[in-house]
Amino acid sequence: MEVNATLIDCCDPQKPSRVLFHFLILDAPSPSNLPTYIKELQHRGVRHLVRVCGPTYDATLVKSRGIDVHSWPFDDGAPPTRAVLDSWLKLLDTELARQQEDPSVPPPTIGVHCVAGLGRAPILVALALVEYGNVSALDAIALIREKRKGAINQTQMHWITKYKRRHQGAGCVIM
C-alpha cells in the first residue's frame, strides 16, 4: 500500500540552496493503513504531523514514534480559522527560530493532512509559501496544483488571494 504524499520545499530566496521547511501534503490515514503511513512519515523524517480534519486514527500511535501530532481541524472546503492560522504560523516560526539559533539543525519536515489532501492541507502549505516567501498566492496555488492535481478550491483560492502577509523574508519553491 502506497501513501499519497506530495513534497514541497520552502527555500530561502537569499540562498536558494537553503531549505527552510519541507512540507509533505497527505490524505488521512485509516486504522488499517496507519502502520504503513507511520513508516512513510519516518522514512521522510517528519517531525510534526498537522491534522486539519477530524480524527480518523489514534494519534498516540504516531506520537509513540517520535512525531508530534497537532490537531487543528477546520471545515472542509473552507479557509483556515484564525486559531488554526495562528497555530500554524507559530509552529513555523518556532521551527525557523530553531534553525537560526543553530544552523546545524536540519530543516524540519512537516506533514499536513486532511481527508483527501486536496483542500485544507494544501491551503496551509500555500499559506506558508505566501507567508515566508516571495511567492504570490496564485503562484503558490499553481505550484501546488502542478504536483497535486485538483488541490485548493475556489473559496480557498479567493481567501488566499486576499490574505495579507504577516512576515517579510524567506522564499518558498517546489523542488
UniProtKB/Swiss-Prot annotation:
The active site is at residues 76, 114. CDD domains: PTP-IVa. Its EC number is 3.1.3.48. GO terms for molecular function: phosphatase activity; protein tyrosine phosphatase activity. GO terms for cellular component: cytoplasm; cytosol; extracellular exosome; host cell cytoplasm; kinetoplast; nucleus. A lipid is attached at residue 172 (S-farnesyl cysteine). Activated in a reduced environment which promotes the reduction of the disulfide bond between the regulatory Cys-53 and catalytic Cys-114 residues. The modification Cysteine methyl ester is found at residue 172. Has protein tyrosine phosphatase activity and may act as a virulence factor to support intracellular survival in host macrophages. PANTHER family: TYROSINE SPECIFIC PROTEIN PHOSPHATASE AND DUAL SPECIFICITY PROTEIN PHOSPHATASE. This is Protein tyrosine phosphatase PRL-1. It comes from Leishmania major. The gene is PRL-1.
